[in-house]
Amino acid sequence: MVFAVSLLLYPLAGLAVLAVPGLLVQLAAGVRDKLWLAALTAPVSIGVYGFAGLASGIPGLSFGIPLALAVTVLLSAIVFGIAWFRRGRTEPAPIEQPDTSLLPALTGRWLLTAKIGAAVLVLGGIALAMQQWHGGLGSWDTYPQEHDTIIHMVLVAYISDTGRAAPWDLLPIDVLTGQPVSFYPSGLPLPAALSGQVSGGPITGFNVVNALITGPVFVLGSAALAAAVFRRLRAGSGWTALAGGAAALVAAGLYRPGVQLLHDGGIAPNAAAMSMAPGVLAALITAGGLRGWGPGSRWLRAVVLGIGVAGVFSVHPSVAATVGLSVVVFWIVEACTKRGREILRGQWPVLLAAGVVAALASATTLLGSASQATRTGTWSPDIPPGPFGDALSSNLKLTYGGYFDPHGIFSQLSAGVLALVGVLVVLALRRAWGVAAMWLFWLAIVVDFRVHPWSGIGSMVGSPFYKSYVRIQSHISLFIPVLAAIAVVFVAIGIIRLAGKPEKPAVFGWARRFAGPVSAASLAVVLAGYVGYAAIPYEHRNAEVIATRYAKPEFTRVNDDDKRAAKFVEEHIKPGERLMNSANDGSTYAYVEDRVPVVNVVTLGSALEPVTYELLRSFRDYPTDPKIRKTVLSLNIGYVYVDSAAPTMGAGPGSPNSWYTAPTFELAPGLQNLDGLPGLSVAFRSGTVTVYKLDRSVLAALPN
């Protein structure tokens, strides 16, 4: 019974966290457009939490559910007040009639049926996307095992524990004092902390929010992007809705961005930001609205859009390149068409206003990310040069690749083929050039990076993404759902129109008289085949991949031994004492779960606090090194945590001041062979985990 309740309750709690602020702000602004509600609800919610995080920097205010609700209500009230006092001062927008020469009309009950069917498709996509995450996690409170999630979990726990969520408070290198601070984007930890407060704690909150953003939010954003493209085609509301439903089904089973980025390193913020990018793009290319400042006006929509952009930027600043480059390519190509120029002329003031709002709302994140820009751009590519043919074919076929499929055996060929057909449809119709151009742009970037990772435009564009192939490669998948939707819709309609070409045989008359309904029915058949042949198998494989980092991990960073050790330390450590540790094992979860202050929250230490990596290198030298001994005493270290079977991680160029030069890292040199050192005794041991008690009086008595 408890399991059944948590199975539903925790995702619902996370859903409320991601949906309520965004919906309230949009509704207060008079936004009733379902496309925008699907595209921007989660980004706007995170943007609102960014304001709440800033407010937590005011003495006496603590980040949590009450403050988040207060900021939501205040912001909604301001927006609603502007809309209310300016009501009646808006000019109606012109109504565009559907282009029936492009798509057959859907009217009356057939239109209603199409919209209901589209809703079913979207809900089915959401269900598939959530199922793969729940299946791979096993339960919502399963410990993450990947490397990057170490910092993410510390951030979520720190926010929950202290209520400090301002950008200048995150990431604290010393969780006991909160200082010094190394900037880390907080857009994902903020909703995860709130979700954990109303569900099962930091781990549950983090897992639920990750699953929701990389699953349903990506599905809804992809549906919104497809709907935005079809709206620009004047396809009519029925076909626009069906295109969104088709895109949702395709998005639900894609391996990238969410599944692979969280599997290959636990790159949660980048995965989340990229998963919200289609929704932001959908809003950007449909920006506009009524003239004036009344409900639903273009200027209030600009405010909403700006808050949403700021929210996604706070999740991972690299999304500026993801969205910015994509939408610039879209506008350049669309500006080459008469209709594109007409739309852009009406949009640019709104987009400019939204940009100003986004810049103001994310000013602190902009400053923080600027401080990290040089570090991000200096990383070396994580792949060697490869042949052009392999680079092109693997990305057209959507090969899995990465740690799960290093030899490129598996692929999501059905989705890749549909996307290629979609590109051919664009060429045949000579419309929707912008979306094909975005896909082609990122395909060219990815292929160039794969062939020339050290030079060229691919390497330059890849700088905000740490020159990581999986991060850059994931951009292609952002446009697969919309291209697939174009393919299935227009191919289904084309088949029916061809069937209705013969003039004499009465058997083909139905294809002419009921072209719209029959085309929609044929689309349903095509999508049913895709679900059975591709979507469900993709979901199963994605769940298997996720399980290798959660439910059935291939390697273990934290297990029951770590949990027992953390509980022991929590019961015995004194106030003000710290636990000496290496963050590469499960020791940081002593802080996440039991609030035990640990010395290291970053696996290789921090350049802002040199003692962190100096102890990782030389802690065991305290009997003979007065400097190390002084550091140990000044930090008031009471216990030492060692896991002799810590997992292997890539060290690369990541160690501060190059204190560690080997390509991989497991157990810190300073924590090896501790048995028998003066003042150090085994206090607890379980499996490969040992906790030593440190008698500081013995250290103080050692000769200098």
Enumerate the language-model features and the residues they cover:
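Membrane-interface helix-loop-helix junctions at transmembrane boundaries of multi-pass membrane enzymes
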Residues: 234-241, 295-296, 339-349, 421-455, ...
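Membrane-interface helix-loop junctions at the exits of transmembrane helices
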Residues: 48-51, 127-134, 162-165, 243-261, ...
